[in-house]
């Protein structure tokens, strides 16, 4: 398999807010350059432009809506996040769930604006359904393990391998990420050994005392 993809979601953690968003992005950029591994960040929406202006690395939005230009007050417009500097977006994160129709509309809008789309899911059947929509990635994250420090790749390996198998049957062009509790080198290694092509993670890096050191530990067994 090729080099993994690592996507770091800042959520609304204090450490990843404002100037902190830039500092963590700098750490990601440094580790990405040293290792050759693609590391992307998903800061809060108002920080996208700030991070993009100061650090050269792939930036994802934490959410976008399936709306076009016009009368959509309070919505996240794909053109706006793209112009702010994002190259992709999460869709349907378990902390920002959407209806099936909304997922489909967000994905359509992401494609229209040339944004890479990661549809988040919570089990094998929803992963299979998401893959049928043909996003760039699906990210399987059992909600009960999110933020727990217990890695999905060790606590529930079947949900990762089951997702990989289900996606391969539906559309082998869709890449599978996994997430929840991932923070250490052995967690990422186990995720890759189960067939995933990368990880979506948050607290283990964003809340670490030294995010750069935490990232270096994360990739040490790749
Ligand atoms: O989006 C990533 C996420 O939900 C996993 O969070 O803190 O368990 O790495 P965490």
UniProtKB/Swiss-Prot annotation:
Pfam families reported for this sequence: TIM
Do you know which SUPFAM superfamilies this protein is assigned to? Triosephosphate isomerase (TIM)
Cystine residue pairs: none
One GO BP annotation of this record: glyceraldehyde-3-phosphate biosynthetic process
Enzyme Commission designation: 5.3.1.1
Q: What class of enzyme is it?
A: isomerase
Q: Which GO terms describe its molecular function?
A: triose-phosphate isomerase activity
Which residues participate in substrate binding?
Answer: 9-11, 146, 181, 202-203
Q: Which residues form the active site?
A: 93 (electrophile), 141 (proton acceptor)
Protein localization:
Cytoplasm
Q: What does the UniProt record say this protein does?
A: Involved in the gluconeogenesis. Catalyzes stereospecifically the conversion of dihydroxyacetone phosphate (DHAP) to D-glyceraldehyde-3-phosphate (G3P).
Q: What is this protein called?
A: Triosephosphate isomerase
